[in-house]
Amino acid sequence: MMNNLDDNFDAILITGPTASGKSALALRLAAEVGGVVINADSMQVYDTLRVVTARPSEEDMQAVPHHLYGHVVAGAAYSTGDWLRDVAVLLQDLQAQNRLPVIVGGTGLYFKALTGGLSDMPAIPEAVRVMLRQRERVEGAESLHRDLTLRDPTVAARLDPRDGQRIIRALEVLEVTGQSISVFQTRSGPMIIDPQRARKLVVLPDRKLLHDRINRRFAMMMDEGAVEEVEALLAQNLSLDMPAMKAIGVSQIAAMLKGEISREDVIEKSSAATRQYAKRQMTWFRNQMNETWERVDPAANRSG
């Protein structure tokens, strides 16, 4: 079933929940077709968190070229638009080299933007971002939601009053443009990859096997440098609002370093959080990825 994947396709796209074996599948397919692997995971872009975010090993990255892994400093914001621009540059280079991109990751929005275009959002000055994050810390998300309700009731009605991230995003656009974020959400930029010219795979493993992998993986991470990575991250004194600080395992290991919980608690809590995240991903993929996305069982295809 996996033979001749490069025939008549401009790219191979692989998504699926965390710990599903999609990275191993991407590595194998890229090696088979002489392609390169491109990251589509919003946490694996950060430099400090190689182990915690389960980036490919150095051995794998040497076996096949890998791009957009660990290229963003932990203290920087990195949006879907930033990722899309980086991918567009890469794809131009790969086309000139006649090499097939194998794009893999669990961030569904990246794939939606890649194949369907991204809403044409305005640039937000850092000062506005900082101001609104500070307001959320002091006043709370529900206070910001009340503000949004007064200024943009239609959008506010769609948002959970506790969803600080989306509330802040809507307020950022209002602050900078004076217009509702909904105005910009209806404007889509060009697609980067024609979905009809891509082989699209969703890795959907057996639930029990996935949970077993998750439970084993975090214990291994603790032995392979996860604690040291989190220590290095905490030493940067970053705002808790930064995406890198929200990676699963960071808050749990930080609590252990403070003496609040044990190593065993870290493994249990982080594994539970990862299982919940994988469940949300599985639901999203089943609902958002239509029949043109081929469902793949990693065990049946020996993808690891």
Curated annotation (Swiss-Prot):
Q: Which domain of life is it from?
A: Bacteria
Q: EC annotation? A: 2.5.1.75
Cofactor(s), names only, from the UniProt record: Mg(2+)
Region Interaction with substrate tRNA: start-end pairs? 41-44, 165-169
Family matches, as Gene3D superfamilies:
1.10.20.140, P-loop containing nucleotide triphosphate hydrolases
| Catalysed reactions, as listed in the record | adenosine(37) in tRNA + dimethylallyl diphosphate = N(6)-dimethylallyladenosine(37) in tRNA + diphosphate
UniProt cross-references to InterPro entries, sorted A to Z: Dimethylallyltransferase, IPT, P-loop_NTPase
Q: Has keyword Nucleotide-binding?
A: yes
Coiled-coil residues are none
**Residues that hold substrate according to the record:** 18-23
The signal peptide stretch is none
Which keywords, in A-to-Z order, does the entry hold?
A: ATP-binding, Magnesium, Nucleotide-binding, Transferase, tRNA processing
Xref: SUPFAM superfamilies = P-loop containing nucleoside triphosphate hydrolases (SSF52540)
Any one GO molecular-function label of the UniProt entry = ATP binding
Instruction: Tell me the residue numbers annotated for binding ATP.
Output: 16-23
Q: Tell me which residues are marked as the site Interaction with substrate tRNA.
A: 107, 129
Quaternary assembly? Monomer.
Q: Which NCBIfam families match?
A: miaA (TIGR00174)
Cited function: Catalyzes the transfer of a dimethylallyl group onto the adenine at position 37 in tRNAs that read codons beginning with uridine, leading to the formation of N6-(dimethylallyl)adenosine (i(6)A).
Q: Name the chain's protein.
A: tRNA dimethylallyltransferase
Give the originating organism: Allorhizobium ampelinum (strain ATCC BAA-846 / DSM 112012 / S4)
Gene name, per UniProt, is miaA
